[in-house]
Amino acid sequence: AASAVWGPSSNQKMIKCGYYSGNGSTTGPIIGVGFEPTTVILKGYSVTGGTAYWYIFDACKKFEAREEGAAWIEYNDYWDKVSGQGIIQQKRTGFQIRGTSTSLNENGGSYLYIAIRGPMRVPNATYGDKPSHFFNCAYGTANTSDVVGSFPGAENAPNFQPDFCMLRKPAASSYQYVSTRKSGYYYRATNNYSGVDTQTTWMHWAVEPGWGTDWDSTYFAWMWKSAPGLTHVEYYKGTGSQQTVTHNLGATPEMMMCWRLGPQGSPTYTAYWHKGLNGGSNPENYFMYAQYSLAQYDVNVWDDTAPTSTQFSLGSQDMVNKSGDEFSMVLFASLAGFQKVGYYAGNGSAGNVINCGFTTGSRFVMIKRTDTGSSNWKQYDTTRGLSSSVSMVLNANDYTAQSDDDFLRQHNTGFELNTSDAEVNASGGNYIYLAVANDPT
């Protein structure tokens, strides 16, 4: 339709058709469509030789925010998928042509495009949406297919395709890795100061359902799918000076997780922001390392500015804004019945219930004390064991294998602290958390 009639307020576009002129350069034309496309279809209609393929790029195969990679289908050929470097780049409000071939970007050539938007609706139980449609945690299946992922979606979410994943070996000493669909094969360890690395075989996003290839049952993954008002992955380039970055979460972020993508092998920390830092007072002046540490005061990380519903701010700190480097940023927000980003003060007594507004308990919980350095990033989930009798913990910041610390119990409204231990419930201690709900029964 010519008018913007889609979306929650019936004022957004779902599809945009148009054309562009090629310039023959690897810094090809930037095509603004007014939204972040997940699928782009291209066709040259006035080029040398008079013919050009139909190209289909989409996020399910390999349509990245990074400049380097893409996979596509040539619609009028017999190949099922072709991969290449520097062909097309996803942007927050459109896309940029990076290839120089006659089929995509001949100098003076004319090309048409069709750009299609991703999900626009905020998850809502009224329409049958469930937490497991947007989050899953599972052991690997050792699937070696490049079509079906090693880590599957939940049983009631057969088409689950995550956009952000964390991965490790629960039963052994192990790194904990993070990766995103937008960064492709790039990943890094949150429990290590070393830089990013690449893995073109295992870090495989072009599968459905699930994620990854050839991960066996000794590996475990936590997986989030982007959804408006819930979770979203952003990619940006550092400037070395103050900058604001527009985001597409569709809500004000309450937690942000950031890491540098390059250069490959360059040491770097993973940085967190959370609305509960400093007990919720001026949290924009603080950040957390993904390490065994307390909240750090530094106005040069988030530029002394809290995120808004449309952008987040960055200061001059290399950790989040080194000039010329690429960064991944994962944004989280609370959504009733699906996910809760919160904070609490410990009371020093077992039985302390943290009310997340859920009705059937928590599928996943991450907790970190912020006012002392002697605490871990503690992770719990129902697949490995979170119930009325067990709480299997993995610390995101260290290498140790999982164990039953007996700290948490399930509670219908969220989770219960079954201990007075200072890591999760010291009297007067400040804690931040991220919790994902169980599906309603």
Residue ranges and their predicted role:
Residues A1-T441:
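Surface-exposed molecular-recognition determinants
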